Amino acid sequence: MVSPSLLGLFYHFYKIFANDIGYNRYGGIFMYIDEIYAARDYIQSRYKNPIDVAIVLGSGLGPLADVINEPVEIDYKDIPYFPVSTVPGHAGKLIVGEIGGKTVACMKGRFHFYEGYDMQKVTMPIRVFSALGIKNLIVTNACGGVRDDLNPGQIVIISDHLSFMMPSPLRGPNLDDFGPRFKDMTDVYTSALRSLAFESAKKVNVDVKEGVYCFFKGPQFETPAEIRAFKTLGADMVGMSTVPEAIVARHSDMNILGISLVTNKAAGLSNNELNHIEVMEAANSAEERLVKLVKQILEDM
């Protein structure tokens, strides 16, 4: 006959390992790491050379990938466990090749929290890039301008971010293979790369400014009241991406350069109704300047 104490012990372990919480805490994290390495191995099977820089392209900014020399195109759907882009303007391809003398892995389309993915899936590509040994990340986005001098068409180098309205992508058991439990976020956007970006911009005569990017979960655009509140807190731009990726890249000790393209004034700062078509059109109109800038940055890195 089984003693009550043994039954109690069995029930304790059942609760830990069999229910959803126990699965996510003790089992899911190991599966996630396996998925990262499976995705890495597949990409390495398609492109065997070392990669210098990973680039994440935001809404309407996909044409930058079109200037890659000798491109190897990999559909996201073919990469094991990779999410799939669902947003217009995000093609859903990883393109590996050469720009400006550097070997790059360029994400033509990214993933957002508002698409229904959890933060681990949203940031999985960054984990895969780290597992590939990539040390440098350029992350771009289309954003709303909050600061008075940030009008549509302006390119902005991200100096810092506000992120407290989102669940941290580092939440849950720590991925010790990638970084420590508690990571310093003082210099998320690497100061040396920010300085380099300004020097590169001068060389190609592209006007750039610097600002603080504020993350909103979306998919709805921000309200005028939210914009007023976050402007008071120091936000210069607002958007629905970039920050989760930057946090995970920083956790993995990658060098990070964030580039925002202002595609509209934020809510309440103009008479125009906000819509995604406007974002795409503004991004497309700035394509030539952004491509020129990023190519020069890559040459100078």
At which residue positions do the language-model features occur?
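Non-catalytic positions within long, well-ordered alpha-helices that form the structural scaffold/packing
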Residues: 130-131, 231, 250
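Zn-dependent metallopeptidase/amidohydrolase metal-coordination segment
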Residues: 240-278
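Metabolite-binding pocket within alpha/beta catalytic cores that recognizes anionic/polar moieties
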Residues: 31-185
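His/Asp/Glu-rich mid-to-C-terminal helical/loop segments that flank catalytic regions of hydrolases
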Residues: 267-301
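Active-site/ligand-binding-proximal alpha/beta "capping" segment
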Residues: 201-236
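Short, Lys/Arg-enriched N-terminal segments with co-localized hydrophobic residues
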Residues: 9-30
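Generic non-transmembrane alpha-helical segments
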Residues: 42, 46, 192, 196-206, ...
